[in-house]
């Protein structure tokens, strides 16, 4: 086991323990997009199941969105060799996106909604206890700033949440993992990564701008990323302007 994998194991198991993400006997569905993050999470979590750290029933789900150039042959081989239960489901969400999104506009928002809808539907149909997503620490940091700057809200990606209809529980075991470690791990493991031909072709995305902003700030103060992350678990409601929060503090 490499130093990088040991580091990933440490932070993933810490998050699972700190936020009580897994229970014995859970039937879980890991969403494998074909990117480095979900591949890294799958490899580490599969190893933790193999060495009996967790007693859970793992199923891998991949959504083929019918994008031009999509080739999952190497992904299938990887999953077969790993010996995990999996399904690659084909849904033509790409066609919907191309039809609905005007030329020049970004696809990410609609693409994300359609993908999420299929994930939730599949999880309910197969009676999954939990849905596992591969978002990492940097995703949380960027999402917080994006919410503040572009939506006027203070929110990010929680380690665990229940969907509004109460039907699905979503967990993110990599909330403490840095993207740079996942990049290194992907190189070490040579994962058969499938690039996204949709978002990869759109350069002026808000997330990229926010990521660059954080990187620039970190050049002046390396603690900026960790400070932003720590702010998510160090909230002072009395110092905010939410009337409902302030009223609840007074009552």
UniProtKB/Swiss-Prot annotation:
It catalyses: cytidine(32) in tRNA + S-sulfanyl-L-cysteinyl-[cysteine desulfurase] + AH2 + ATP = 2-thiocytidine(32) in tRNA + L-cysteinyl-[cysteine desulfurase] + A + AMP + diphosphate + H(+). Its cofactor is Mg(2+); [4Fe-4S] cluster. Gene3D superfamilies: HUPs. [4Fe-4S] cluster binds at residues 108, 111, 199. It is found in: Cytoplasm. Transmembrane segments: none annotated. GO terms for molecular function: 4 iron, 4 sulfur cluster binding; ATP binding; magnesium ion binding; sulfurtransferase activity; tRNA binding. The thiolation reaction likely consists of two steps: a first activation step by ATP to form an adenylated intermediate of the target base of tRNA, and a second nucleophilic substitution step of the sulfur (S) atom supplied by the hydrosulfide attached to the Fe-S cluster. This is tRNA-cytidine(32) 2-sulfurtransferase 2. The gene is ttcA2.
